[in-house]
Amino acid sequence: MKKITGFFLLIFLNFSCEQDESYKQVLTDPETFQAAVKQLTDVIVYDIFSPPVASRIYSYPSIAAFEVIRHIDPSKYRTLAGQITDLTKAPEPVDEVNLHLASLHAYLTVGKALIFSEEKMQTYIDKLYERLEDKGLPRSVKKASLAYGTQVANHILEWSGGDMYKQTRTFPKYTIQDEPEKWKPTPPDYMEGIEPHWREIRPLVIDSAGQFEPIDPEAFSLEEGTEFHRQLMEVYEVGKSLDEEQTAIAEFWDCNPYVSHHRGHAMFATKKITPGGHWMGIVAIATRQAGNSFDETVEVYTKTSISLFDAFISCWDEKWRSIVIRPETVINQYLDEDWLPLLQTPPFPEYTSGHSVISRAAAITLTDYYGDDFAFNDTTEVEYGLPAREFESFLQASEEAAISRLYGGIHYMMAIENGVDQGEEVGKFVIANLKTRKEAQEATF
């Protein structure tokens, strides 16, 4: 009888130990971090942040998470402090800290501080920690890990406060200029220009907003035979004769966070991910497909989000320097007042194409990790009612994202082609000057 009792006691103790340790399986699972990123994306969509601002919201939480999780293997990872502008070293972890939990907490804490709907993030956080407690997370480990995560989050938030974002909220709005070549608000809502002072935001890796200034746009002209007129007519004619594939490409890469719809006197809007959010979705696909660990997943999100952040600064610097008029405005005024682009024209100047710049920068970064033949099925837009698209590489995806803006009727080819070149320069500069690994460690998968 004693032997039988002892046998069942042993089984019970083993089961209890497994239950007590199961929280570690949740925390080391990269899907736990993937879910946190998805939650942040969902709130960004809900709060309708503009593409440049969304890139800021993606980058700072990722940096916070990386600065924690890098301690999981000090022989492998290096700090971003000293590599990113003005960033100093974050506090070091102490005993009893679970680095996966601390990294998650740093990510969620910084993310919550940067969005409007804090209650949505807090609800997610509360449910996550409740789940971990149910899986046996010890109170002492939770307390130490959250305390450390908060320390790092506060360090990143204090540093982020010096990037001129708050100051630019009070800067004057763009004053519409009368010159025919200058950008004007576009239908249907004629919204004010978004982020005309984004060039003032402190870059993370590039030296300055104007470091990779593209060549000048073609001079405005309605005279036949001029390059501007040729490109204008190209947008007009392509828009009138789109085939099924071109339409699908344009819609897949629309990524407009706020599209208004007018029906008589009624107006409603649809919300979608930003262009940067789409590339965060591609990071999710790539890291899952490659079987990356939790720390590797954080690493790839971090470097890609940094490339996106700097690419938006570079692009917006040119947009609000050249202030090029959109095709829709010129076509409606001089060629065809009834012509409509397939996509709703975003409320900011035309040159260069944001999709072209940021997609190329992200693709260069991801190619550095996974190679130039990493085929994937892009399901990012499925939840928004669009079918998945297959790509042979990240660069191919970025090229399709770029040309989609011609099909959408919102960009001239000069903005697309020169935007790709601009994004390539940004991406190459980031991978050359930002190292997440120690010298002996190859950051490829």
Over which residues does each language-model region extend?
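N-terminal hydrophobic targeting signals that begin at the initiator methionine
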Residues: 1-2, 18
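Sec-dependent signal peptide recognition
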Residues: 2-8
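A periodicity- and composition-biased signal for non-globular, repetitive helical segments
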Residues: 8-9, 361
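Enrichment for repetitive, rod-forming helical segments
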Residues: 9-10, 412
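C-terminal motif of bacterial Sec signal peptides marking the signal peptidase cleavage site
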Residues: 13-16
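Acidic/polar surface patches and capping/hinge elements
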Residues: 18-445
